[in-house]
Structure formats: structure tokens, C-alpha cells
């Protein structure tokens, strides 16, 4: 695991952001998102073992991948993980709580496959058939995957044109099968109660790989988390709805309080916003909030948010 394409910032910048990609991709999948984040933020996109330029020593191990990211972090950081990268981020936050200031999990999961205690999972994950296709012609099939995720996105061709050359240049990930096997075996549900940082969950309403019900499960289990479903997004909201996603993430990170509790006002229900008011300038969002955990005694509110403005 190595730190890659680090963007430098002002010397006094206090926020450090790490982006962790998903299965079958590499750090360049974030090439369209990074310029949309504040220029004062130091942002690093990393390659998971056996992806991009990162070497691969078998077996692919999620805990080891999380430890490798932690080794790069010298001060509590804001972590954004997509899909498999979100699973790695969960292990990172649970195993190295001193390294994580906040989490954003987009189109991710605590467990991928369903069982009798976890109906939110997939009955039969369909990613396996992509392994052979990626190995046969990675550039062709990663492009097709991106086109599917960006269906109906106005600037789809432009987005793909900006990220595909570097994404495809790295070639087929050497850990393709091993990383998929690890993702299908993984079960991070026992870690969720250990995570005590602000968490933003962003899911796509049309995502068939990690459907919104997986986000709802995480939202129930991660205390103080905030769930946002982008109704018309699929498995890559940060690509298909880049501006809205970047604004959402920017607001989240800026709202994280530098307090030991790590709580944010954004996670409080409307009644608690009366107790601790914060302006809401985005009435187009159909907002609901989780139960208050601040001890004020307010009753639980319906959970989750839906972004539907502007065709999102």
C-alpha cells in the first residue's frame, strides 16, 4: 500500500482527507472528485494492495489493508471509502480510532452477502462474472462499468474521458479475485458499535451492488450517523452526481467538531437543532434525522435523507 497522487495544501490546513477506492478500480477513480474539494484540504487517494501501482503480497487481507492506510496517517484524518474501500475504512476506524476524525462511506457495506440475520445483503453477489471480463480486457470493461454507473449523467463522456486513461493505464488489478473473495467473506458488523466518530453514509437509489438497504443497516448500527440516498445515482454517486456529492461531503467535513466526542450538529434531529441551532439553507432536501444521542430527551425521528433536487 502506498500513498498516491497527494494534493498539497496551505501549511496551516487542519483537515487531511484520505480517499479509498473500491474493488476493481484504483486511486484514479477519484480524479474527477478531487478538484471539486476545497483547495486548502490536503487530499490523498491511495491504492489498495494489488490495485493500481500498489504491490500485492497474497493473501488479500482487509485488516492488513486498513493497517497499511493507518500507517500513512500522522494526525486524525477524514476518511472517505467507496464500496470495498468503505469496508476497509470501517476496519480502519475500529482498529485505529486515534487515526480517524470522520468517516464517509459511499455505496459500501458491513457485510456483502445475506444470511438469516442479515437480509440486507445480496443473495448471490454478481461481481464474480466481472473478474473474467476484467482480466480479458480491463480497459474495455472498466469503461463499460463506468458507462453503466453514469447512465443519464449529462457529462458522462467528459467524466470518463478525464479518469479512464489513468484508471486503465494501471491495468488489471493483480488482486482482482482475491480482493473479491475477501469482500464476500468479510463481516464487519461486530465492529460497528466500536466506531465513535461522525459518519456520513451516501448511497445511490438505483444501486444494485450495494442497495440503499445496506446503508439503512449501517445507519441503524452506527451511532450518530447520517444517511443520504441520491435517488437517481447508482454505485458511484461521487462520479454520476459529482457536484452534489462534493458539496455534501464538504459540508459534512466542515461541520465536524474538533471535540473529543466528535459529534456534528448535522446528526441531530430538528428538535435538537432548536436546542443547538444551526442554519439549514437547503430546504430542497427532504430531511429527517436519527434519534438524539445528546441526552436532551427528544424522541426518535424517522431516519435518512433523500436528495431529489435538480434531478439528483
UniProtKB/Swiss-Prot annotation:
GO MF annotation list: pimelyl-[acyl-carrier protein] methyl ester esterase activity
InterPro entries in alphabetical order: AB_hydrolase_1 (IPR000073), AB_hydrolase_fold (IPR029058), AB_hydrolase_sf (IPR050266), BioH (IPR010076)
Class of this enzyme: hydrolase
Signal peptide: none
Residue positions binding substrate: 23, 83-84, 145-149, 235
Organism superkingdom: Bacteria
GO biological process, one term: biotin biosynthetic process
Keywords, comma-separated and alphabetical: Biotin biosynthesis, Cytoplasm, Hydrolase, Serine esterase
Active site residues per record: 83, 207, 235
Record pathway: Cofactor biosynthesis; biotin biosynthesis
Residue ranges constituting the AB hydrolase-1 domain according to the UniProt record: 17-241
GO cellular component, one term: membrane
Keyword Hydrolase: yes
Cellular location(s): Cytoplasm
Record field: catalytic activity: 6-carboxyhexanoyl-[ACP] methyl ester + H2O = 6-carboxyhexanoyl-[ACP] + methanol + H(+)
EC number: 3.1.1.85
Keyword Cytoplasm: yes
One protein family per Pfam: Abhydrolase_1
UniProt similarity note: Belongs to the AB hydrolase superfamily. Carboxylesterase BioH family.
Physiological role: The physiological role of BioH is to remove the methyl group introduced by BioC when the pimeloyl moiety is complete. It allows to synthesize pimeloyl-ACP via the fatty acid synthetic pathway through the hydrolysis of the ester bonds of pimeloyl-ACP esters.
PANTHER family: AB HYDROLASE SUPERFAMILY PROTEIN YCLE, MONOACYLGLYCEROL LIPASE
Self-association state and partner proteins as the record states: Monomer.
Matches recorded under HAMAP family: Carboxylester
Protein name: Pimeloyl-[acyl-carrier protein] methyl ester esterase
UniProt gene name: bioH
